[in-house]
Amino acid sequence: MKQSNRIVVYKSSTGFTKKYAEMIAERMECALADYRSVSADMLSGYDVVIFGTRVHAGMMDGYQKAKKLFEKSGVSRLILFVTGATPNAAAETVEAFWKQNLSSDELAKIPHFYMQSGLCYEKMSLADRLMMKVAAVMVKNKKNKTAQDIEFEQAIRSSYDISSIEYIEPLISYLNSLKD
C-alpha cells in the first residue's frame, strides 16, 4: 500500500544517507526527495516527513536549516535518522550525539534513529578529507591511547561500508506503528 502522506527527504554527501533513504522509501512505498529539491510548499502536502542526514564533525549536517523548512511547511510529524561511521553497538556514543544535537524537548517529541554506514574518502570533499587526515595524525601522535582511540585510529585508515538494510528496521517498525 503506497504511503502517499509520507516522504523521505535526505541530505547526502558520500551516498550513505541516500542509500538508506532509498531503502526506507522503497520499503514504505512512499515518496523520496533530495533535500536540495524540496520547498516548504512541497512538504505541506505530506503528514509525515522522514529526514535523513549524516553525522558531520559530531553534528547533524543541515538539520537546523531543514528544521526551519519543516516548521514553515506545517508538517504534523517529523522523524529523524542520521548515518555515521560509528558502529550501532557504541550506544553511549550515539546517545551522547543525540543529546548534543537535539534539545530535551526535541529528544522527547521527535522520533530519532541512528544507522551505521561508513566512510568514503573518494566521495568526501577536500575539506572533509583534510579534517579526517588531521584527526588521524592527532590520534596517531597521542600518548597513552585509550582503547577507543585505537579503535578510532583503525576505523579512519581507509574507506569502508558497514551499512545494512537491517539498520532501517527500528525506523520501519516505528512507521508501521503509526496510525495515519
Segments the model singles out, each with a brief description of its role:
Residues 3-4, 58-180:
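FMN-binding flavodoxin-like domain, especially the glycine-rich phosphate-binding loop
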